């Protein structure tokens, strides 16, 4: 097999405290770009921003087909290496100098769990990059989205029919970084990383890096706004949604599931996407914030919840379940009333239904971790802590374990998807019932956004408190953890509380544009 050429360049570039303005300057209207940001949970102070300025390859999956689309000459040099790497596991459907389409065999649902995990699968469309560039002096970076519906390729879907809702989203969509801007807000430093996959492109890429550095001297802090409606529609009104909850409670009563998370989708116009993301960050700073700008959609959000995190150095795998919520305590003027806020938190902590729901999901996270981790390494590191956000507060826990040596982060994600806080338990039956009753794909909602590096490190957040924008319309989906004694209206209201932060940011931005 041909060796994988890799040369990396780094340079310090001017620091700017507003990554959204940097993104507007470097990537405005440019597809296949993304911004991933992190903030400290309690203080909400920005920690780090990762801005994928230029992508070499877009990797997208739908069903068992994976497409590798070279976006640059640099990326095109990698396609033959990918084909060679995957040759034994795929059938090649089409091949050009700029694009490679391959198809994997479907998962064998009759195989045992470990055999399923270790078998060739669509996850190898991403794994091939970590294997090709394992020796890279600077870890090669893949950033993007795992959709919720990726799981449908790995669980039995017999007799489940999904309606076409007019929204299109790949099962996964990742970008191989050609130029990555790494911003450290604590040190107030910025570094531009360039990844060269063919020696013929070294000079061109170094020149591109210089051009990016110059643009960083002229950041545009303000965005033009377009007028838009503030009317919100919902795919399931309260009555229809409560009927779904009532029918799902029958399945809980019969013992099919212990708990389940139905959801519904709110929609409204959103022509000012980046300005709305900035407004959301300002209103609701969160541990994980993201903005993905694809040719076919834009996805942005401020998620409080990690999906799966893995450190290759320690082989520690981590799940951060969030379950149990209350609205924040606002006074009549819309300001936080500390006394009311504290009372609501105490009510949340003492609520037996919320405790039961949370502990059930901690147990599910323990089961997920145990499936892929070494014996006796799984433990609950934090239990039922309180996290506060702009409009809602949550109970959170942290479950960790040491990944088995024959597995990697993608094996772990395959075993754990989708996260229990968006599905519930038993997980496979819950996901089947969700499809049966919602009757539509969830697309990005309940999936994961994050990155994978060639050194094996992996960090993702659950796609909640997010907006999926396509054809000028944004879709904000939110769910509720339903148990046997759940109140129907309370569950419907919970979806509204969870969607409020994103909807408010969209409405605020549209109102500014309409002035």
Predicted ranges, named:
Residues 1-515:
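Extended alpha-helical targeting/anchoring segments
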């Amino acid at each position: 097999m041909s060796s994988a050429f890799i040369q990396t360049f780094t340079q310090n570039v001017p620091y700017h405290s507003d990554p959204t303005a940097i993104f507007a300057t470097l990537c405005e209207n440019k597809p296949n770009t993304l911004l991933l940001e992190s903030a400290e949970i309690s203080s909400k102070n920005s920690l780090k921003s990762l801005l994928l300025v230029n992508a070499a390859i877009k990797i997208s999956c739908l069903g068992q087909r994976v497409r590798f689309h070279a976006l640059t000459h640099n990326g095109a040099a990698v396609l033959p290496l990918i084909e060679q790497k995957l040759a034994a596991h795929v059938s090649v459907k089409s091949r050009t100098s700029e694009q490679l389409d391959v198809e994997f065999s479907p998962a064998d649902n009759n195989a045992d769990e470990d055999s399923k995990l270790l078998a060739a699968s669509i996850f190898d469309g991403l794994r091939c990059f970590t294997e090709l560039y394992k020796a890279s002096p600077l870890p090669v970076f893949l950033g993007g989205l795992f959709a919720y519906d990726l799981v449908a390729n790995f669980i039995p879907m017999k007799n489940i029919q999904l309606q076409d809702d007019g929204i299109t989203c790949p099962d996964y969509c990742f970008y191989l970084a050609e130029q990555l801007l790494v911003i450290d807000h604590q040190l107030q430093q910025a570094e531009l990383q360039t990844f060269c996959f063919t020696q013929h492109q070294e000079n061109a890429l170094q020149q591109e890096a210089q051009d990016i550095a110059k643009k960083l001297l002229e950041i545009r802090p303000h965005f033009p706004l377009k007028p838009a409606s503030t009317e919100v529609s919902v795919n399931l009104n309260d009555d229809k949604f409560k009927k779904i909850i009532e029918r799902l409670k029958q399945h809980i009563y019969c013992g099919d599931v212990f708990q389940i998370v139905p959801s519904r989708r709110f929609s409204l116009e959103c022509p000012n996407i980046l300005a709305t993301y900035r407004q959301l960050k300002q209103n609701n700073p969160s541990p994980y914030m993201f903005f993905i700008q694809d040719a076919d959609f834009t996805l942005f959000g401020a998620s409080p919840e990690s999906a799966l995190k893995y450190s290759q150095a320690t082989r520690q795998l981590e799940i951060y379940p969030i379950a149990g919520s209350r609205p924040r305590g606002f006074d009549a003027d819309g300001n936080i009333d500390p006394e009311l806020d504290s009372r609501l938190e105490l009510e949340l902590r003492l609520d037996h239904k919320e405790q039961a729901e949370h502990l059930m999901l901690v147990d599910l996270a323990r089961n997920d971790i145990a499936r892929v981790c070494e014996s006796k390494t799984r433990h609950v590191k934090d239990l039922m802590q309180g996290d506060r956000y702009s409009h809602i507060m949550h109970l959170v826990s942290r479950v960790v374990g040491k990944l088995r040596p024959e597995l990697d982060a993608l094996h772990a994600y395959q075993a754990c998807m989708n996260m229990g806080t968006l599905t519930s338990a038993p997980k496979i039956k819950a996901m089947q019932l969700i499809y049966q009753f919602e009757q539509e794909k969830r697309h990005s909602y309940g999936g994961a956004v994050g990155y994978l590096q060639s050194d094996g490190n992996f960090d993702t957040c659950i796609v909640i408190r997010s907006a999926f924008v396509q054809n000028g319309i944004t879709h904000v989906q939110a769910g509720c953890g339903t148990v046997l004694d759940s109140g129907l209206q309370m569950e419907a209201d919970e979806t509204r509380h969870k969607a409020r932060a994103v909807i408010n940011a969209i409405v605020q931005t549209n109102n500014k544009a309409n002035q």
